[in-house]
């Protein structure tokens, strides 16, 4: 109880105002406190519950404040009306939830309830109101999410959630296999919470996962994708991904409904072969999977870079890629093959074409970036000119941003080989140089710095003339300046008149 005593010491009977952790620790915020007070005055039990209690116990400021109560939905609506509060029926009859709006914030107030699960892989088939707080806490997924607190700061911890927080351990409420079989999405939530909280999964939790794998086939792609995205942008995404892959969850499939029929969508089976895959020790400290996790951890927590990091070496060890040359393990072509695999994965995940193609470009070009960054004789400007001519990017700024992303990925790739941050200095300088080259390289005629009279000079061959000017600038035959473009336009017009 030592940890909790530090947190609850700032709670007083009549104080519900928010307070910063620097000044007084964390307390129940004003709106939640008012709701708990109103419930108590009406003779009802009321507690903050779930993630907000967990966050308080970890010294964090909760983002959401959920409340559980003995009051039925109609009673909660009556209490809200008596206080002049805005209240929304959030599925009261079925789920017992009323949403109270106070100070511009929404508070979900839910009646104590129990749940029975059936054929649906995620939603309960039957929800009934419970009589006690303990019954309500028993239905929750993990011990750290199954704690409640009253308005006076008293903690209700029936399942050892506080102890698990102190031990940085994620453990299921009761039997892990039963909890996962009830709601298969909890499998992905377990991976996410491990990543978000920097916890270790309890051995009982890991053992309980496999029995629920058949239920994953009934989960929607949308739900799984949401959990995956939240996992990947977590600070400790490597922990969560390691659990996802090593447990076997990555080899399962969810589903999507299209044209009236369900289609199977594999999670991420392509990653499984990387576990334990050896790499040439001269260049790599870790096997292919630990390397991938290290790269993932070394990138900034944004979806684009995290997906690129996760998939950048996905083709290593594949037939036709893995070979032994002169006694060394090699994976020549893994960047190109990996780009194809990344496109397949993100397409089946129904990611946007723009997002998919940028991840694909990063995966496909990460080895090329390493080569150019380490080869002073390589013609970097030629690379930029070719990209501009091939219309790979919509603008010069988009090309510059992509090179900065590629720089960050490749720096993480170096760190993931077990090398220090100082080893990335050359890549940092080269990436910034490539971004600057890109900003000076026009991708479309709109980025040519021509004077206003050039279109009139080129008429009636404006489109052809502009494309000619753009091509010459991209080839390095013409400067992108008003004077040079004006003279070139005059010469083009003269040739077409003659």
Where are these regions (language model features)?
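Catalytic cores of the polymerase beta-like nucleotidyltransferase superfamily
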Residues: 1-498
């Amino acid at each position: 109880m030592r940890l909790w005593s530090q947190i609850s010491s700032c709670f007083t009977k009549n104080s519900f105002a928010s307070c910063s952790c620097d000044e007084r620790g964390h307390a129940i915020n004003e709106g939640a406190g008012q709701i708990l007070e109103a419930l108590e005055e009406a003779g009802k039990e009321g507690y903050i519950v779930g993630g907000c209690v967990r966050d308080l116990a970890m010294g964090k400021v909760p983002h959401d404040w959920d409340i559980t109560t003995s009051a039925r939905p109609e009673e909660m609506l009556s209490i809200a009306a008596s206080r002049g509060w805005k209240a929304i029926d959030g599925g009261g009859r079925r789920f017992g939830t009323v949403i109270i709006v106070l100070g511009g914030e929404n508070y979900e107030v839910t009646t104590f309830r129990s749940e029975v699960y059936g054929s649906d892989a995620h939603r309960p088939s039957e929800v009934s109101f419970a009589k006690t707080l303990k019954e309500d806490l028993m239905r929750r997924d993990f011990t750290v999410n199954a704690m409640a607190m009253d308005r006076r700061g008293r903690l209700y911890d029936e399942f050892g959630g506080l102890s698990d927080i102190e031990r940085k351990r994620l453990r299921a409420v009761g039997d892990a296999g039963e909890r996962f079989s009830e709601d298969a999405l909890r499998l992905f939530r377990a991976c996410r919470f491990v990543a978000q909280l920097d916890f270790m999964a309890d051995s009982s939790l890991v053992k309980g996962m496999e029995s629920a794998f058949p239920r994953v086939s009934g989960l929607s792609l949308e739900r799984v994708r949401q959990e995956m995205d939240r996992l990947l942008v977590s600070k400790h995404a490597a922990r969560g991904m390691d659990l996802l892959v090593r447990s076997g969850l990555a080899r399962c499939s969810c589903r999507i409904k299209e044209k009236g029929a369900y289609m199977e969508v594999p999670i991420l089976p392509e990653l499984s072969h990387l576990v334990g895959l050896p790499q040439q020790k001269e260049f790599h400290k870790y096997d292919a999977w630990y390397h991938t996790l290290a790269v993932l951890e070394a990138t900034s927590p944004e979806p684009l870079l995290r997906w690129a990091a996760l998939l950048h070496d996905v083709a290593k060890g594949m037939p036709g890629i893995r070979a032994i040359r002169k006694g060394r393990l090699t994976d020549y072509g893994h960047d190109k093959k990996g780009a194809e695999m990344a496109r397949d994965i993100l397409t089946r995940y129904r990611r946007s074409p723009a997002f998919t193609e940028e991840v694909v470009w990063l995966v496909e070009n990460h080895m090329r970036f390493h080569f150019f960054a380490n080869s002073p004789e390589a013609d970097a400007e030629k690379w930029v000119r070719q990209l501009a001519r091939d219309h790979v990017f919509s603008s010069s700024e988009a090309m510059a941003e992509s090179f900065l992303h590629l720089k960050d990925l490749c720096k993480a790739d170096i760190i993931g080989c077990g090398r220090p941050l100082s080893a990335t200095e050359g890549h940092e300088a080269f990436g910034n140089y490539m971004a600057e080259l890109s900003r000076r390289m026009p991708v479309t005629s709109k980025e040519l710095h021509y004077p206003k009279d050039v279109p009139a000079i080129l008429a009636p061959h404006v489109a052809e003339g502009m494309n000619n000017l753009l091509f010459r600038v991209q080839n390095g035959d013409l400067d992108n300046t008003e004077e040079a473009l004006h003279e070139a336009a005059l010469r083009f017009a003269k040739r077409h008149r003659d």
